[in-house]
Structure formats: C-alpha cells, structure tokens
Regions:
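Glycine-rich phosphate/adenosyl-contacting loop at the front of the ribokinase-like
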Residues: 2-83
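A short, structured active-site edge motif that brings together acidic residues
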Residues: 86-93
Length: 93
C-alpha cells in the first residue's frame, strides 16, 4: 500500500480534541511566559487533521464543551477540513 492508496480512504478517528497553550517565546517556562500560543490539541484531532492533509477524508468522534474552548475546537476542525458530523456539544458541565 502506498500513499496514493491511503489518500483514497476515509477514516473515523475516535478521541479527544482540545486547546493547547504553549509559552511564548518557545522554551520559556510556563510560569514565566508573558504570552501564550494557542493551537488545536489532542492526539486524535491532530491525527485526523494529518490524514486530511495527506488527502484522506477523516471524521472525528468526540465531545466538546459548549463554551469558548469548545467553539475554538470546532472552528479548528473546520479549518483543517476534519468532518465533525460525530462531534457532540456537551452543555452544563
């Protein structure tokens, strides 16, 4: 199997999506950082995004909170082209 064969496939990835905060400048200790860089986190979400980047179709099965962090995660999944049909918003947590 080569990369062209993989790119024709559809993947269903089960796991977490989240928001990563990294200190800026890189290498700074978190407690000393004056700025933070925000990025999509969660190994499953990043795997799904990587599969899409390789030309595959990928959907993520997960839950997100119905708040600013959850909305950020949904926007990032859209940005990377990950199908979020199976992403459920959880309220009241």
């Amino acid at each position: 199997m080569n990369l062209d064969d993989i790119a024709k496939r559809t993947f269903l990835v089960i796991g977490r999506v989240g928001m990563d905060l990294s200190p800026d400048p890189p290498g700074a200790r978190t407690k000393d950082a004056t700025q933070m860089v925000v990025a999509m986190g969660g190994s499953s979400a990043n795997i799904a995004a990587g599969l899409v980047k390789l030309g595959c179709k990928a959907a993520l099965v997960t839950c997100v909170s119905d708040d600013a962090i959850g909305w950020y995660c949904l926007n990032q999944l859209d940005h990377y082209g990950v199908d979020r049909t199976y992403v459920k918003k959880i309220t009241g947590e």
